[in-house]
Amino acid sequence: HQGVHDVLLGSTTLNLVHHTDLPVLVVKRPAEGPYERVLVPADFSERTRSALNLAAELVPDQVLRVLHVYNLDALDNVLRNRVERSEVDRIKADVRAERQQELDAFLLNADVHPDRVEGQLRMGYAPDELQAAVDEWDAQLVVMGTHGRNRLADALLGGVARRVVHQVKGADVLLVRS
């Protein structure tokens, strides 16, 4: 029954997200009181900014963790057996530094006081790294921005949102339209 439940949950939730401008909360755990540990996955877009702003309003006295995950598997595949390992490591370090600068700039330009946000950068497959971050920090809520009414963008995001709604365990998920 869990598989059917997950399919219905995902399709119903995403259908609701597509037809309302209101945030949609998917409750996945028993309530333990107000949210204290809130995680915001970040791709540095306007939708992430909207999610971060709403998260800051929801938990005005808590620090928010903003997570950016990047993946270098394609780079590894292209460079494997073509470039010295030390050069691959240097390129990866450069990419990490660039992503860190992007995260720092995003947080600096956010509408949330810098003392209220904490950035975290992880390399890997985004759904797995998001779950690992939820587990490590014992996050209670994941606040994720979604696209507006653009059909192609909605279709693309639908896959990401669907994976987050289905795969994140141990935390509620709040989907926020930008």
Task: State where each predicted segment sits.
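Gly/Ser-rich helix-loop-strand patches that form or flank binding pockets
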Residues: 1-32, 133-178
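General small-molecule cofactor/ligand-binding pocket signal
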Residues: 25, 65-67, 118-122, 174
